[in-house]
Structures are given as structure tokens and as C-alpha cells.
């Protein structure tokens, strides 16, 4: 219906249609398709019509048309593509589709529009503690949802199954033989996929250590050693906005750490001393000696003060001193005009931070991959956004036996999985499961 912003497409995108394809795509085995012709069914003979989509998602074709017309004709329009649907099989396609729609309608780089995800929000300096050569030693980096598969199948695991990141040394392609896990502030039994496989894998490990400020399902079920981490009430720190934002909040220490709890950094520093003595301990945490484990306040103050003066004030033009910030409790940046993601690219012609300098509907990096085994992805990803059927969906043959699709959103009563064991909260609510009203009526519920 010609509702797209063709001028925006021509100026700022790569691969949206035939007219925005790069020259190299003509001879590319993986990068020869453009998004428009994919949608029209030019390549596979299947036009991606509202009727086609309705059969997949269960939303009527008429409603899809209404929503599409509303979004395309509303200027400006903010499409807030949240992260949850992307935490699914082939979830990156959902995120890429959101960005394609935003670019197609010219809603990137303008006030009232939205860039995909958090929208390249204005950000603060986020790192106060050291990142030195010892803090960043790593043997292998794998996809977080592949660890259980590795544990259960080692050594018969390929690098692509592990989602192994490439390296430039002798360890490239070496799948780790995982003997134990350090779960640091992360409730994997709640957050990752295929929990039954994880429960099976954790029983094979020789050591499981959990660091957290609450007893999560992971900590209660899996931990051989449970190290209590102090909360932000029990240590001196600075609060940064999630995910990005234009302010800082000073968090003074309110109470002494309860019981045997220590901060994460205290725990890791003490482990560094015990593993490698003074050489490794001082290298990991240059400002601390062994007394840091029992008295962290002075060292934390030194890190935070240096971070504020050397990074925040130096990089971001902040004139308020660390001492004044502590007195006031908050610092808010004054912006001359509303922050708009990619305003400079659209209004001033600055290149986007991509190989082409444009919004890459056709991804240069993906199109040029010839050996998917030697990538951090672990499997083939199409060069343009495409619909790929998840291996478990309502269109699966399994629905004959399992007709419902379970979705587990954040309950309004807690944050992810934490505080579920708080007795006061448990007295106010009971965790509930909801079912579609039409299904409930059909089943007499």
C-alpha cells in the first residue's frame, strides 16, 4: 500500500529492498536476498500476508491489518519491542523484525519514534571496579543455555553445539569439560530454557557454588556451597538507572552486613588471595589487602571516588565533586534537548555503527560467514530477518498431546524469582496460572 517511508529507506538502510542492496551482495552466497522480496514471497513462493501470519499467531488477519495501518500512518510512532519474546527459539528474528518495522516507517532518529530494544538510551559510566588482566582471564565462552548440553554429552559435543566463541590461540574450538559452576547472582533454574535438562546436568557436576543475597531455587537445589552476598543496604555504592539513563543516585551504607554476608567483590578478592596468594590477590584487587574481606568501606570509597573523578567528571563533563554528590544524594544530567537515539545519524549524516554505516536489514557480518562452526552463534542465522518456526510452538505435532503453550511472564508480586520466599509477600498473594477465556469456557473452567 506504499505506506513505507521510502526516502528514509533509501537514505539509511541496507537490504530493505532491491534498491538498497550493496554491490557485494550480487556475488554473495548468503547475502543476495532483500527484505521486501522475502515478504512478497519472491524467493520461496509464500507471500507473508496477514492471512499467512494469522494461521501462525492466532490473531485475526483483520486485526493484523488494522494494527499495521495504524502503526504505518501514525507519525511519529514508538514501537516498543520488549525483550521477552526474543528469549525463545530463533528469538533474534523477532528483534530484527522490530528494527525493520521501525526503519521501514522512518521512526528511527526522531522524537517520538523508537529504536529497537532499549533504544540506544543515554547512558552513564557504569564501571567503578577494576577490569585488569587477571579479572578478565577466561578459558572459553559459551552460550549460557548450552552448559547443560555440554555437561550431559561431553566429550561428544561440537563447537557449534556449545556456541563456542572463536579464539586466536591454541584453545580455539576446545569445548570445556565443565566440572563445576559458579552461580553469581543469577537464578538459572528460573531464567534459562530447558530446565529439566539443567536439573539433570547439575547432578553430574563436582562442585556448585552460589553467590546471592536471597535463597533462589538454584541456590536451594543446586548449591554445595552457598555464599551470602550483602545487599545494597549493607555496602557503599552508586545506583545507575536500568538499563540506561541520565542520573546517578548515591547509596550510602545503611546497616552492617547481616550474618556472614559479604559483597561480591569482597568474596572474589578473598578467593583470589587464597588461590594465588598476594601476587594474584593484589593483581585482582590492587587497592586491597587481606583486611578488605573484613573491612571493605575504605577500599570501596577509594574505588568509587576515583571512578567519579576520573570517569564521570572527566568523560561526561560533570562538575559536582564526589563529596558534594554524597551530600546531595543524586545527580541528574541536564540535557539541552530530549535525547533521541540516532538523531545525529538521521539529522547530521553521521554513519551508523555498522560495517556499512547504515541500518542493516541485510546484515553484512552474517552474509559474509562461510563457516558457521567457527562463530559465536552456533547455528545458521539468515542474513535478513525471517520467520523461522520454533521447535516447540502451537504448530508443533506435539500439540495433539499437549495443546497449550505455557508462557511465564514476570509476576507482579516479585522481581524475576527473588523474594518469592518472603513470608510477608506470600501472605498477600498466591501464585496463579491464567488461561485464555475462550479455552476456559470450552473446558468448563
Which residues does each PLM region occupy?
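Structural signal for hydrophobic packing residues in well-ordered secondary-structure cores
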Residues: 1-3, 43, 61, 68-75, ...
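Glycine/threonine-rich phosphate-binding loop and adjacent beta-strand/alpha-helix elements that clamp
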Residues: 233-257, 267-268, 272-274
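Extended redox/cofactor-interaction regions of prokaryotic respiratory oxidoreductases
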Residues: 100-221, 231-238, 326-443
Amino acid at each position: 500500500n506504499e505506506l513505507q517511508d521510502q526516502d528514509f529507506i533509501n537514505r539509511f538502510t541496507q537490504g530493505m529492498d532491491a534498491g538498497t542492496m550493496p554491490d557485494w551482495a550480487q556475488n554473495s552466497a548468503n547475502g543476495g536476498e532483500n527484505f521486501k522480496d522475502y515478504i512478497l514471497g519472491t524467493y520461496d513462493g509464500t507471500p507473508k500476508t496477514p492471512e499467512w501470519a494469522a494461521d501462525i499467531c492466532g490473531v485475526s488477519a483483520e486485526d493484523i491489518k488494522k494494527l499495521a495501518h495504524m502503526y504505518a500512518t501514525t507519525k511519529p510512532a514508538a514501537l516498543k519491542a520488549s525483550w521477552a519474546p526474543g528469549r525463545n527459539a530463533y528469538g533474534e528474528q523477532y528483534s530484527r523484525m522490530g528494527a525493520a518495522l521501525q526503519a521501514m516507517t522512518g521512526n528511527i532518529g526522531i522524537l517520538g519514534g523508537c529504536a529497537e530494544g532499549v533504544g540506544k538510551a543515554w547512558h552513564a559510566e557504569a564501571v567503578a571496579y577494576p577490569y585488569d588482566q587477571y579479572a578478565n582471564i577466561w578459558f572459553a565462552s559459551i552460550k549460557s543455555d548450552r552448559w547443560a548440553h555440554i555437561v550431559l554429552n561431553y566429550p561428544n559435543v561440537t563447537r557449534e553445539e556449545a556456541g563456542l566463541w572463536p579464539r586466536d590461540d591454541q584453545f580455539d574450538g576446545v569445548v570445556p569439560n565443565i566440572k563445576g559452576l559458579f552461580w553469581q547472582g543469577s537464578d538459572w533454574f528460573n531464567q534459562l530454557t530447558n530446565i529439566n535438562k539443567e536439573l539433570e546436568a547439575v547432578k553430574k557436576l563436582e562442585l556448585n557454588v552460589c553467590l546471592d543475597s536471597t535463597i533462589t531455587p538454584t541456590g536451594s537445589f543446586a548449591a554445595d556451597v552457598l555464599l551470602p552476598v550483602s545487599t545494597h543496604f549493607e555496602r557503599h555504592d552508586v545506583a545507575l538507572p536500568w538499563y540506561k539513563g541520565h542520573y546517578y543516585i548515591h547509596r550510602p551504607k545503611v546497616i552492617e552486613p547481616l550474618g556472614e554476608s559479604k559483597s561480591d567483590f569482597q568474596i572474589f578478592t578473598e578467593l583470589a588471595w587464597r588461590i594465588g596468594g598476594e601476587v594474584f590477590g593484589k593483581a585482582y584487587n590492587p587497592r586491597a589487602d587481606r583486611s578488605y574481606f573484613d573491612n571493605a568501606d575504605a577500599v570501596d570509597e577509594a574505588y568509587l571516588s576515583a571512578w567519579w573523578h576520573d570517569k564521570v567528571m572527566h568523560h561526561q563533563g560533570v562538575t559536582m565533586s564526589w563529596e558534594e554528590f554524597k551530600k546531595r544524594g543524586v545527580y541528574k544530567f541536564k540535557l539541552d534537548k530530549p535525547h533521541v537515539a540516532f538523531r545525529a545519524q538521521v539529522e547530521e549524516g553521521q554513519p551508523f555503527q555498522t560495517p556499512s554505516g547504515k541500518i542493516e536489514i541485510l546484515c553484512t557480518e552474517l552474509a559474509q560467514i562461510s563457516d558457521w562452526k567457527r562463530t559465536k552463534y552456533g547455528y545458521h542465522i539468515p542474513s535478513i530477518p525471517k520467520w523461522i518456526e520454533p521447535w516447540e510452538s502451537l504448530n508443533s505435532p506435539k500439540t495433539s498431546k499437549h495443546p497449550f503453550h505455557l508462557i511465564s511472564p514476570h509476576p507482579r508480586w516479585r522481581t524475576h524469582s527473588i523474594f518469592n520466599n518472603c513470608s510477608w509477600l506470600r501472605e498477600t498473594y498466591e501464585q496463579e496460572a491464567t488461561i485464555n477465556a475462550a479455552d476456559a469456557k470450552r473446558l468448563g473452567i
